[in-house]
A protein has these predicted regions:
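Sec-dependent signal peptide recognition
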Residues: 13-20
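N-terminal Sec signal peptide cleavage junction
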Residues: 28-31
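Cell-envelope/ECM-targeting effectors and their regulatory/trafficking segments
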Residues: 49-68, 92, 132, 188-192, ...
Length: 268
């Protein structure tokens, strides 16, 4: 009797723990849709700002509809050495540098809803991106930006763009990745001019739009120290050079090289 009673007690206790655990899992699973609800794709602030093929003017107009001070942020608008996508790269940087929290609530929260496990599926884009970390890196970015302070804007540099273009050509011709080659970042930049205080470089591969390229670097999937994100949000970088082109390993979109500096003076 006692043994049977003990077994019955253990069964009831284990069943209670099972139902409590199941309830906890259901509650946690429900958290994500409550926080990151599917966006209304008819509104101006949805993924449409990230659509492929937008001119600088079209991108700026869609951002204006989302309440951004585009005249202030679109610092590359008159840079005739940049094409529209390269101008959009600078504008996309300035969005998140100017108001990280707004960027998170408008765009990162939206991108989170496009993850299915570790696959990222952007509406209207056939290519499916397979990530290593899945949605967790994007959710981390969201909360990180809520705690991030605004920093100064970036302004285009023709000479830094030359350095970026040189490196993009180098890696594309060889079908390789990374920041090495031609002596490294410092040597490449110093062939063109003199930099002050700090320099940095980011590379985005195979992005379907400039907006997506910056978002991809901010999410920084499988980069443990989130170095791309840190550079984009770094205080004290004022100048940026951008180069866009095709990379043979990423034929479904454009690749971008970005060179940053506190200040830069070209050689005479």
């Amino acid at each position: 009797m006692t043994i049977k009673a003990d077994k019955r007690y253990l069964f009831i206790r284990e069943a209670a723990w099972f139902f409590l655990l199941a309830f906890f899992i259901i509650q946690c699973t429900a958290c994500s849709p409550l926080l990151f609800q599917k966006v209304n794709t008819e509104s101006a602030s949805t993924a449409r700002v990230g659509d492929p093929g937008l001119s600088n003017e079209e991108y700026a107009m869609r951002l204006l509809a989302d309440g951004w001070p585009v005249d202030t942020l679109n610092t590359g608008v008159n840079a005739d050495f940049l094409d529209d996508d390269e101008k959009n790269i600078i504008l996309a940087h300035n969005l998140v540098r100017y108001d990280p929290e707004k960027y998170a609530r408008l765009y990162v929260a939206e991108y989170i809803t496009y993850f299915m496990d570790k696959e990222f599926r952007y509406p209207g884009v056939e290519t499916i991106m397979l990530t290593r970390e899945g949605v967790s890196a994007a959710e981390e970015l969201y909360f990180d930006l809520l705690r991030t302070r605004a920093v100064n804007l970036l302004y285009p540099s023709e000479d830094l763009s030359k350095a970026a273009r040189s490196h993009l050509r180098y890696i594309s011709q060889r079908g390789i990745r990374g920041h090495g080659g031609q002596g490294g970042l410092r040597a490449r930049i110093e062939r063109i001019g003199i930099w002050e205080e700090r320099i940095a470089e980011n590379i985005a591969y195979g992005s379907f739009s400039a907006h997506d390229a910056v978002m991809y670097m901010l999410i920084d999937d499988q980069v443990i120290n989130r170095s791309h994100r840190k550079i984009i949000l770094q205080h004290g970088l004022h100048k940026v050079g951008v180069a866009k082109g095709m990379h043979p390993a990423y034929p479904t979109g454009y690749s971008y090289v970005m060179n940053y500096a506190y200040d830069f003076t070209p050689h005479d």
